[in-house]
UniProtKB/Swiss-Prot annotation:
Family annotation (InterPro entries): AfsR-DnrI-RedD_regulator, BTAD, NB-ARC, OmpR/PhoB-type_DNA-bd, P-loop_NTPase, Sig_transdc_resp-reg_C-effctor, TPR-like_helical_dom_sf, TPR_rpt
Encoding gene, per UniProt annotation: afsR
Known role: Global regulatory protein for secondary metabolite formation.
Name used for this protein in its record: Regulatory protein AfsR
Domain notes: The N-terminal and the C-terminal regions are independently capable of directing actinorhodin production.
Start and end residues of each NB-ARC domain: 280-579
Location of the region described as Disordered in the Swiss-Prot/TrEMBL record: 1-21
Keywords, ordered alphabetically: Activator, Antibiotic biosynthesis, ATP-binding, DNA-binding, Nucleotide-binding, Phosphoprotein, Pigment, Repeat, TPR repeat, Transcription, Transcription regulation, Two-component regulatory system
DNA bind region: 17-113, 796-811, 974-988
Single GO biological process annotation from the record: phosphorelay signal transduction system
Source species, domain of life: Bacteria
Entries under Pfam families matching the protein: BTAD (PF03704), NB-ARC (PF00931), TPR_10 (PF13374), TPR_12 (PF13424), Trans_reg_C (PF00486)
GO molecular function (one): ADP binding
PTM: Phosphorylated by AfsK.
Length: 993
């Protein structure tokens, strides 16, 4: 048959490609009326002809008489030739569609024989029905996904461009149905804790449908659960005023009740639904517990005691659900971690929303900082890096909010003291924490304290037997008792001794007992507990092969909480496979732990012993300088790899050419995603390596490693640790009187301070860095710090001074052929020109910067170029062009996981939309900026809130606008920002109206 004219077009959203390739017809009415075959659009004719097709499709196979079709197309005033026109339209459509699809019968027409799901509306109905069933069954995750797929089938206005009263009626009907689906999906979003994400969408929807109270109710709840109580109450005030002005009525009872519950801070408002507690999003369900040992033995009374406490938290006890904390105290090696991990694994089913674990390194020289731990926990719970605040208090509050309504078990291992632990505790019922420490945490309020002593002799013997084997122990029971006694009944010592015997099939238990007795006599000056552990370590170490002993000594030197296989290979100067074989053999002897595939760590007592062995070996002249050489290789490995990551993320940036040379190679990556994954995964051991190099000949390389890893400054989870390391290196380089190294250290510190919005402190560091870099004739640092100082000037509105600094940076970058640096300074110079009122020059300079970025490839830095040009075009009033630039920037920032820059771009999009008279779109983008966070910390958040207030004011939401301005004013006042006066004026004008 004649298939009719066909126009190639992209596949219709919502229809799977495999279905379209089958040759079957597909139709769309949830947008323009269209038809497809094999992915190509069919010509469906004039608007009236499409109106006829839509009327037949929406009758779902039922016959429409000619009279009904005439009424549908023209209503009460049809043309004189209406019947002939209907017949003509039907005839033309038959030629386009498959045979037998449009049929004539009983004086009318019908569409028949369509494949299942051929009509987008039918697919949406099926998906919505399936979503309702999933929701009723308690599977909210699946229900949300189904509703999202249903809503994605809409492609603009229903029956767009189709005339006639029938089409108008269907537009209203299907528009109302879509809103109902949206409300249902948003309700489930809130049930599953997606509060911040929902605020943006709800803000836009309430602006588009201001009298729809259900949307207002959802917005109030989303704001309240996002910690924005004042705005939530302001939404109610705006709604009450609007309903009174427009309809002369009060808000419905449900909305009034919600307002009262918010005023009373009703704790039930913060709770998620019961279904949500059972079906928490899988991707946000961490399972971080270390593996439990297969030979766990004894401690039955402690297991019962701790399990009972966890049962109270999980709601399985008679008293109902509580927030439970248990703190285990005992000497090193007594088995605190083993017991806690064993109990935690037994209780996993009672905490279906996840289990968090951290080694707090409380017995080490550098215990983990609560800020850093909270950052890692928040990331594991699904919080974006950009949404993680800087301060300990804010991180702890966000952590408690994220855990609210969830049932999560937190294992805080090897804690230093209660002060380290308190910020890491959940805040609501249903969660629990297990804490291990060497001190009794009597000052940890409400904690159930457990004192763990050495094992009873029979328990110790049972553990020894389980590792060695019943057959070998049965005939030498007394010797076995002598062994566990010589181990001081400490589980760690018993495990190491037993593992050594298990690996020596020719030894008897008596031989092991005699060797331990000899070691203890040699170490009789030690205290009893230390004596037992040291003797066990000596025995284990003394039986290692030379290669194993060397690996044991050198791996203990690194300060990080753990070490990757690749980094360990650098420490040992061995191929990866040989390194893995050695490390796994040490795991078999219980001298090393496998924290995760490809990652290893020491028990802190074993690490101390390994370092003592390294010192002793070097002191005795058996391996001169092996410690320094090993740590130097580790630093080289991190520096070379981080430099490679930097080069991938910043092509054309010659900074890497000026780094200290390395003798040991690093890893190589072919694409940015894997490179950034490595950097974020290795953040803690990498920064530990930097700090460990202070006061050594490795100082300059350590500072360069900090510089090469500067992407960590924009990672919310790592920024605090990075800043602390930068400050430590500033002190170390100052003490060493190394001007070049100190200049670079202070340059990266000024970066951190700029990103977090601490402008005055950033200026202090940048000025000092420039003086130091100039004295050291470090041209790379001079150019970058000039750029940083220029950015400080932009924040402080000292535009002419900033312009001079950017010109200095551009000249320096050009002198060293640093194209990426040149592009960055050009983009910033554009902003300085804007501040001085030179809009045309700003646009031209921004285009120059973008052109340089474009030469370097489609990288994250190209996004910075589009961003800068978008800002300039906005000031020039060229709003549509600006939107295009920001859209390009947003895509690139998203591809490179630069969420803070995504937030900044959404802020700029909000500016454009507001300037173009689209306050609803402006409010939506401002909300997205708040959810993502922005470069600039609290000051930038103040800017976003001030802009959001302007958009809401334009939408008639005066109370919520004032709430935003008040919060912005509070943030500005904390930082003594120049915008204080502007926001006060906005508030004054708003109140005066």
């Amino acid at each position: 048959m004649d298939g009719g004219p066909r126009v190639p077009e992209q596949r219709r959203p919502g229809f799977p490609a495999e279905e379209e390739e089958s040759g079957a017809l597909r139709f769309g009415v949830l947008g323009p009326v269209r038809a497809w075959r094999d992915g190509e659009t069919l010509a469906t004719g004039s608007p009236q002809q499409r109106a006829l097709l839509a009327a037949l499709l929406l009758r779902e196979g039922r016959t429409a008489t000619a009279g009904e079709l005439i009424d549908a197309l023209w209503g009460e005033e049809p043309p004189s030739q209406a019947l002939a026109a209907v017949r003509t339209y039907a005839s033309r459509l038959r030629k386009v569609l498959d045979p037998g699809v449009l049929v004539s019968e009983s004086g009318g027409y019908a569409v028949r024989g369509l494949a299942e799901g051929a009509l987008d509306l039918a697919r949406a109905q099926d998906l919505a029905s399936a979503a309702e069933k999933a929701r009723s069954a308690g599977d909210l995750c699946h229900a949300r996904d189904l509703l999202r797929r249903a809503l994605d089938l809409w492609d603009g206005e229903v029956l767009a461009g189709v005339p006639g009263p029938y089409a108008q009626t269907q537009r209203v009907r299907l528009g109302e149905w879509r809103l109902q689906l949206l409300e249902t999906r948003l309700d489930m979003d809130l049930d599953q804790g997606c509060h911040a994400e929902a605020v943006s969408e709800l803000t836009a929807l309430t602006a588009a449908h201001p009298l729809r109270e259900r949307l207002r109710e959802l917005l109030m709840l989303a704001l309240y659960r996002s910690g924005r109580q004042a705005e939530a109450l302001a939404v109610y005030a705006d709604t009450r005023r609007l309903l009174a002005d427009e309809l002369g009525v009060d808000p419905r009872p449900g909305l009034q009740e919600l307002q009262q519950r918010i005023l009373q801070a009703d704790p039930a408002l913060a709770e998620l639904s019961a279904a949500t507690a059972e079906t928490a999003t899988a991707t946000l369900r961490p399972a971080q517990l270390p593996a439990t040992v297969s030979d766990f033995t004894g401690r039955a009374a402690f297991v019962r005691e701790l399990s009972d406490v966890l049962s109270a938290a999980s709601g399985e006890s008679a008293s109902g659900r509580v927030m439970a904390v248990s703190a285990l105290a005992g000497i090193g090696g007594v088995g605190k971690t083993t017991l806690a991990v064993h109990v935690a694994h037994r209780a996993r089913a009672a905490f279906p929303d996840g289990q968090l674990y951290v080694d707090l390194q409380g017995a080490g020289a550098r215990p983990a900082e609560p800020e850093t731990v909270l950052g890692s926990f928040l990331r594991a719970l699904g919080t974006a890096d950009s949404a993680i605040p800087d301060s300990l208090e804010e991180r702890a509050a966000l952590y408690r909010s994220v855990l609210d309504g969830r049932r999560v078990l937190v294992l805080l291992d090897n804690a230093r003291d209660a002060a380290q632990v308190r910020p890491l505790l959940p805040g609501t019922d249903g969660c629990a924490a297990l804490v291990t420490a060497r001190v009794r945490m009597v000052d940890l309020a409400g904690a159930h304290l457990v004192d763990l002593d050495v094992m009873a002799p029979e328990e110790a013997l049972a553990l020894f037997t389980k590792i060695v084997g019943e057959e070998r122990v049965a005939s030498e029971r007394q010797a076995a008792l002598d062994v566990v006694g010589a181990c001081g009944f400490l589980p760690l010592a018993i495990r190491i001794a037993a593992s050594r015997l298990a690996a020596r099939r020719t030894w008897t238990v008596s031989v092991l007992a005699a060797k331990l007795a000899d070691e203890r006599r040699r170490l009789d000056e030690l205290q009893a507990g230390d004596q037992a552990v040291e003797a066990t370590f000596e025995l284990g170490y003394g039986q290692l092969e030379p290669a194993q002993a060397r690996a044991f000594r050198l791996l203990g030197l690194a300060d990080g909480p753990d070490i990757s296989l690749a980094a360990a290979a650098a420490v040992l100067d061995l191929p990866a496979q040989d390194t893995e074989d050695l490390l796994e053999s040490l795991v078999d002897t219980s001298l090393l732990e496998s924290a995760a595939p490809g990652r290893y760590r020491f028990h802190d007592l074993v690490r101390l012993y390994a370092r003592a062995c390294a010192e002793r070996t070097e002191r005795d002249g058996n391996a001169p300088s092996e410690r320094g050489a090993a740590l130097s290789r580790l630093l080289d490995f991190y520096l070379a790899t981080a430099a490679g990551v930097y080069a991938i993320e910043r092509p054309g940036d010659r900074l890497v050419d000026g780094l200290e040379p390395t003798e040991y190679p690093g890893l190589t990556f072919t694409e940015g995603s894997a490179a950034l994954d490595w950097l974020y995964t290795e953040a803690a051991p990498l920064l530990a390596c930097v700090r460990q190099s202070a006061g050594t000949a490795r100082l300059r390389r350590a500072v360069d490693l900090l510089w090469a890893a500067k992407d960590l400054t924009e990672s919310g989870a790592n920024s605090h640790q990075y800043e602390a390391t930068a400050r430590a290196m500033c002190d170390a380089t100052g003490s060493a009187a190394d001007t070049r190294a100190e200049g670079r250290a202070r340059t990266v510190l000024s970066d951190v301070l700029l990103v977090s919005g601490r402008i005055e402190h950033a200026e202090e560091e940048a000025r000092l860095a420039m003086r130091l870099a100039g004295s050291a004739e470090d041209s790379a640092a001079v150019s970058w710090v000039a750029n940083n100082r220029g950015l400080v000037c932009l924040h402080q509105r000292r535009y002419a001074e900033g312009k001079g600094l950017f010109h200095q940076a551009i000249a320096g970058f050009r002198a060293t052929d640093n194209r990426a640096g040149e592009a960055s300074a050009l983009s910033n110079l554009s902003r300085a020109q804007l501040g001085m009122g030179n809009v045309a020059e700003a646009v031209d300079i921004a285009r120059q910067g973008l052109a340089v970025y474009a030469e370097l490839g489609r990288t994250m830095r190209l996004a910075n170029g589009h961003f800068a040009l978008g800002v300039a075009l906005t000031r020039a009033g060229r709003h549509e062009e600006a939107l295009g630039e920001f859209a390009e920037a947003l895509d690139l920032f998203g591809d490179h996981r630069q969420r803070l820059w995504e937030g900044a771009t959404n802020f700029r999009l909000a500016e454009v939309h507001l300037a173009a008279g689209r306050p609803s779109s402006a409010a939506q983008h401002a909300e997205q900026a708040l959810a993502l966070g922005c470069i600039g910390g609290d000051r930038m958040r103040g800017n976003v809130l001030a802009l959001l207030g302007r958009a809401l004011s334009a939408l008639g939401q005066a109370d919520r606008a004032r709430a935003c301005w008040r919060e912005a004013l509070s943030l500005y006042e904390q930082h003594d920002a120049q915008e204080v006066g502007e926001v006060r004026a906005l508030l004054a004008r708003s109140v005066a109206r």
